[in-house]
Amino acid sequence: MSRFTSATHGLNLSIKMPISVSQVPSIRSNTSKYELQKLRSTGRSVLQTRRQLAIINMTKRSEADDNDGVERRKGVFHPNLWDDGFIQSLSTVYHEQASYRERAERLIGEVKAVFDSISMGDGDQFISPSAYDTAWVARVPAIDGSSRPQFPQAIDWILLNQQQDGSWGSQSHLSLTHRLTDTLACVIALASWKIESVQIDEGLDFITRGVEKLQSESVPAEFEIIFAELLNQAKSLQLSLPYEHSCLQSLWRKQEPILANGLMDSVAKRSLSSLEEMQDHRMNTDSDGTMHVESFLSSPAVAARVLMRTGNPICLAYLNNVLNKFGDYVPGMYPVDLFQRLWMVDNVERLGIDRHFKKEIQVTLDYVYSYWNGKGIGCGRDSLSPDLNSTSLGFRTLRLHGYNVSADVLEHFKDRDGKFVCSSNPTVGEIRSVLNLYRASLLAFPGEKVMEEAETFARRYLEEIVQKIPPSKFSREIEYVLEFGWQSTVPRWEARSYIDFHGLDTYSPWTIYEMASEKFLELAKLEFNIFNSLQHTELQYLSRWWNDSGMSQMRFTRHRNVEYYTMASCIAMEPSQSAFRIGFTKLCGIATCIDDIYDTYGTIDELKLFREAVKRWDPSAIESLPEYMKSVYMVLYELVNEMAQDTERTQGRDTLDYARNAWEAIIDAHLVEAEWIASGHIPTFEEYLENSKVTSGLHIAILPILTLDVPLPDQLPLQEIDTLSRFHHLASTIGRLSGDMNAYKIDLAHGEESSCISCYMKDNPGTTEGDAHNYANVTISYLMKELNLELMGQHNRVSFLRTSKKPAFDIYRASNYMYKYRDGYTIADKETKNLVMRTLVQAVSL
């Protein structure tokens, strides 16, 4: 057992010595008798006393080194933001109180039951009623020509489901526009059949009050179209509403240009959820007037409108089928068995609770894939036409899980000119479809031109649309996806963000999964907070370890253990992955110290001595080192040995030589960069990248992956996961290019002239810093596609590689986040601080 207790042995903080007394640095004469007596009086053993004295001597030497006459460069960074007192004070109740865990376990069981019901074909019970669609169905007259409703049960549902405030619709929807639309549709349905009911008056009163409030709200174009047309119908029925109100007059004025712009004309195969509100001449028809019934066989409201106009028997059969399923109401969409499954998987993954449902996710995606075809999918297996939303979400989810899906499926959503197009006044359905198209496009493989076209189109569309729609959870979700995409986010950060804007689209005219959505969100919040308690415990241990090791006394280096632990816990969110989180944090902490020694603090002679000590791998090697390096060397030595023991317990294989080789490689590469700095040499771009792939540290950061409970096959050489593998080559190169672009000016300020920017400009005389940035961005874009292929392609031979690449990719993504705006390791008091606060310090409100 090493002196710092193994991460896989809980958080026992006892300190033991792995080396003999003769190997402990001797007590220097500059240790006072008072200090010696004070240490001995605490009852420590001789070995513990000697170690503490070594730390005291190291501290004194570190202070003396500042005035030792050696010219030393200093890094440009701010002090540690999180002192030990603050860390030790962190506390929550969620891990301690069993009631939270018990509630979470019940919710896990309930969500599993939802998955199971859906897989058995009984998922309709989780689809919520749509007051809006039910109102349209209630208006359909009997097909036999009698003066009665064809679907009287829909009238009964309206009469039985008015809210106390006079409105109709889901009470969970806070959007006023949503409630107004539902209520007016239901009032019109009742009035159409001349039903004498106080409920009509109560509904009209709610609308009148709502119109007054509407003046202070920003409303979407979708509402303007739908509500204005409903107002026309209400006026024809002589319903008492404030038609002269300025707000309603404004809606009417806006309606005509919106319709004149051809809302439905230019969009290929898009959602038709608002078609029922268009004027008759805007119905989806061919030039000869033939109507496309298949376009609206997933929308009860559209089917009802067409049935009223045409008596189409397919629409009648469709509505009969839906009401047979749900009784006296209809949902906003049906059938949705494919989209429902994709929605389930997408939500549990984005909320960070997917680890509980791995089996269910596999079964669910196998079902979706069985209906996948070259043109994509619709909402349901019986959909006659694919839609962009279901296809985009399906493509993204299936590719992420390793299914063989071709990007060519997106070609079917272009217009005749081969372009993705949109309407001038889009609906929520269209925006959601384009958002999922953008998310899918970020998983492009090399050579997939349609994915590049989709990304360009969707990004431009979303950037414009987010400026137009009202602030809402949906708009914040769009902003998040645009800002972080796929390569610059990590699971816990995404979960924390998605908890904030998870829910029903705030102004969509229908909802389908209200009950399941509430369960998902409650479970996600509980899981987030329970894990938050474990984070505090682990971080408190790590803070004590850092202090006990003497590393906290090093003034020349960045102290970023809280930030590194935050990254680790954003990547590995399972409680059982403690060894990974702790090992990752320790390794990154010592790697940063060594990086700062080689980048700024050490002399070339000292750096060579440290390299030789690492190659010897013997505690006695510290005698040749400067005082400030001794403690660093011993922490490195013991940590690497400790983690090799952890890995051997997990994998049953000795990985010490592999870990030592990884450290020797990074220190050799650090020395090369130090010599470049000392001599003022600027290498070629290729030479720089080749060396910096190693100094990026990815092959060090991934070592804790070996502690995960993923068996390493006996026949798999360790070199398969080494820095020479293609996956790590790509990730390291992208990481270095991304980091250099944001750290270039800071590095230049403290003497590091070698970076991808300066090397490119040297190789290409006459080019500017902007040219170098453009070249780096183009290179990153290409390499990201290669990296996607490595992660999600069909060629991975060994299950360990497929499984281990995901956390390795998440480490790369975490690094991308840290360098997204600036060097987030050096300047950690801005975006990095926000990451720490939101994913580690603060719990979420239940």
Swiss-Prot record:
Upper taxonomic lineage: Eukaryota, Viridiplantae, Streptophyta, Embryophyta, Tracheophyta
Catalytic activity: (2E,6E,10E)-geranylgeranyl diphosphate = pseudolaratriene + diphosphate
Pathway membership: Terpene metabolism
Result of changing A701C: Reduces catalytic activity 2-fold
Cofactor: Mg(2+)
Known outcome of mutating Y564W: Almost abolishes catalytic activity
Coiled coil: none
Origin species: Pseudolarix amabilis
Effect of G697S: Strongly reduces catalytic activity
EC number, as in UniProt: 4.2.3.180
Family note: Belongs to the terpene synthase family.
Tissue specificity note: Expressed in young and mature roots. Expressed at low levels in barks.
Residue span of motif DDXXD motif: 595-599
Protein name from the UniProt record: Pseudolaratriene synthase, chloroplastic
Residues passing through the membrane, by range: none
Transit peptide location on this chain: 1-58
Molecular-function annotations in GO: magnesium ion binding; terpene synthase activity
Function field: Converts geranylgeranyl diphosphate to an new 5,7-fused bicyclic diterpene, named pseudolaratriene. Catalyzes the first committed step in pseudolaric acid B (PAB) biosynthesis. PAB exhibits antiproliferative activity by inhibiting microtubule polymerization, and has demonstrated antitumor properties against several cancer types.
Predominant location category: plastid
Gene3D superfamilies attached to this UniProt entry: 1.50.10.160, Farnesyl Diphosphate Synthase, Terpene synthase, N-terminal domain
Keywords noted in UniProt: Chloroplast, Lyase, Magnesium, Metal-binding, Plastid, Transit peptide
Listed GO biological process terms: diterpenoid biosynthetic process
Positions of Mg(2+) 1 binding: D595, D599
Subcellular location: Plastid, Chloroplast
Lineage: superkingdom: Eukaryota
Pfam families from the UniProt entry: Terpene_synth (PF01397), Terpene_synth_C (PF03936)
CDD domains: Terpene_cyclase_plant_C1 (cd00684)
GO CC, one annotated term: chloroplast
